[in-house]
Amino acid sequence: MEKLEKLYEGKAKQLYATDDPEVLWVEYKNTATAGDGEKKEDFTGKGRLNNLITTIIFDLLKKRGIDSHLIKRVDDTGQLVRKVNMFPLEIVLRNVAAGHFCSRLGVEEGLPLKEPVLEYFLKNDDLHDPFVNDDDLVALGVCTREDLAEIAPLARKINEALIEIFAKIDVKLVDFKIEMGRATDGTLLLADEITPDSCRLWDQKDHSGKVEHLDKDLFRRGLGSIIPAYEEIEERLAELAKSEGIEVAE
């Protein structure tokens, strides 16, 4: 498969055409950003780790009946993915109060939520990805009621699967954001990535109750390098994947 012209560049990834019109090449970058891109730094090895982590998680989800756009990992920082028509939407699932949820509702970080909270944010850099509800999305033509009737249960299914996956490696899944799109045949697919960039992950190995971040909050809050945490997540996920018979790149 040949990588052709660049189609798009975001904060964490680049997207390229290939010689197959139904296949795209995703290239993971070493850049970490926070605060709508105001804070920015390169971390050597981050792109490789996020490529590995997303590949492993998508493979684990596939074993649990959840399909994604991933075809395969092709090198350290590259993936081949199915071309999908993306919804311009960040889909957020929250299991524990943290981040924007706390500042918006005045609750303490770490509060366990009585049930998972599903939220939508419109992807719009100029508006800082505003929080929107179902009616907003339908009124703006972002998606239909029928789309939402598929998106919401799939998002909740992904949440349940990820809670189980991360619990097996002694990590609490606090919250995460995902994206979805439709393949050319109309199938709704999980797309984009699932990495410590897009999740809040708290280490539970010592069972002390103390919060130890294994995610991009280390960068957001100036708590140190993200690389050791990302390496730890990749190593634990790789061991889990191998135990489930999934081939993992060394």
Curated annotation (Swiss-Prot):
GO terms for biological process: 'de novo' IMP biosynthetic process; cobalamin biosynthetic process. Pfam families: SAICAR_synt (PF01259). It catalyses: 5-amino-1-(5-phospho-D-ribosyl)imidazole-4-carboxylate + L-aspartate + ATP = (2S)-2-[5-amino-1-(5-phospho-beta-D-ribosyl)imidazole-4-carboxamido]succinate + ADP + phosphate + 2 H(+). InterPro entries: SAICAR_synt/ADE2_N, SAICAR_synt_PurC, SAICAR_synth, SAICAR_synthetase. Pathway: Purine metabolism; IMP biosynthesis via de novo pathway; 5-amino-1-(5-phospho-D-ribosyl)imidazole-4-carboxamide from 5-amino-1-(5-phospho-D-ribosyl)imidazole-4-carboxylate: step 1/2. It comes from the Bacteria. NCBIfam families: purC. Gene3D superfamilies: ATP-grasp fold, B domain, Phosphorylase Kinase, domain 1. The gene is purC. Its EC number is 6.3.2.6. Belongs to the SAICAR synthetase family. One of its GO terms (molecular function) is ATP binding. It comes from Bifidobacterium longum (strain NCC 2705). This is Phosphoribosylaminoimidazole-succinocarboxamide synthase.
